[in-house]
């Protein structure tokens, strides 16, 4: 995955999670994602799979399309 895309997605996940008032612990429980993996996602160093995107987006109240909107 392109480094720029990982950075944008990571920022978007972190900002949206914080805006919703969801702690990292609660987000990890809701998605089944480990805390170290969430940390890597949010700092833009993790590679995303579609499976992970389909876990993250609903936990943020979004569709995968909305999560990826504007990223080329």
What function would you assign to each model-found segment?
Residues 1-19:
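A short, Lys/Arg-rich alpha-helix, primarily the initiator
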Residues 2-4, 58, 68-72:
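Short, charged recognition helix plus adjacent turn
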Residues 17, 28, 57:
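The alpha-helix within a helix-turn-helix
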Residues 18, 32, 43, 72:
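Residue-level detection of the helix-turn-helix DNA-binding "recognition helix"
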Residues 21-40:
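Short alpha-helical DNA-recognition segment
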Residues 35-40, 51-54, 69:
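Base-recognition residues in the alpha-helical recognition helix of bacterial helix-turn-helix
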Residues 49-66:
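DNA major-groove recognition helix of helix-turn-helix/homeodomain DNA-binding modules
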């Amino acid at each position: 995955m392109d480094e720029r895309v990982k950075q944008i997605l990571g920022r978007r996940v972190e900002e949206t999670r914080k805006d919703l008032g969801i702690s990292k612990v609660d987000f990890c429980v809701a998605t089944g994602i480990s805390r170290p993996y969430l940390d890597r996602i949010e700092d833009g160093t993790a590679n995303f799979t579609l499976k992970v995107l389909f876990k993250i987006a609903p936990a943020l109240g979004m569709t995968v399309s909305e999560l990826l909107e504007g990223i080329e």
